[in-house]
A protein has these predicted regions:
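Beta-strand-enriched cores of mature, soluble protein domains
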Residues: 1-139
């Protein structure tokens, strides 16, 4: 069951690299710098590996990153899988899951969180916006 909103991510894609094709389609590497607000706040640097299927309309990928919180703590972020579909040329609605790892005693609760996210990637304007929710265990 979806739980509380953990964070809102608003970022700029600082680098977009089209790599050689793979079996799934066109492979794209995206690096992003983001501001994060919510239950967790701070800034992040992330790298995402995305493939866009040959239909140009759907795709998926994975990513990883580092969040530096407003309190100076570090959180490793891993996006093991995400999916998306085009809503207009260069713009995708995306969704997926995310896990966290930290040694911070104040944030160690994140080590047991599976997050789910949804948002938009605007390749033309190099922007991305994502909301991350906690996927809660059944009672």
């Amino acid at each position: 069951m979806l739980g509380d909103l953990l964070m809102e991510i608003n970022g700029q894609m600082t680098s977009i690299t089209v790599e050689p094709p793979v079996a799934e389609g066109t492979k794209v590497q995206v690096q992003a710098a983001s501001e994060i607000s919510g239950r967790v706040s701070g800034a992040s640097l992330e790298t995402h590996y995305v493939f866009i299927r040959s239909d140009g309309q759907t795709g998926g990928g994975e990513g990883h990153g580092l969040i530096n919180t407003a309190d100076g703590e570090a959180i490793q972020v891993y996006y093991p899988w995400g999916m998306g579909r085009a809503t207009s040329p260069g713009t995708f609605t995306v969704k997926g899951c995310v896990t966290f790892s930290t040694v911070s005693s104040d944030l160690e609760w994140l080590n047991e969180v599976l997050g789910v996210w949804e948002g938009t990637w605007d390749l033309a304007n190099r922007e991305w916006r994502t909301s991350v929710y906690e996927w809660e265990y059944p009672e």
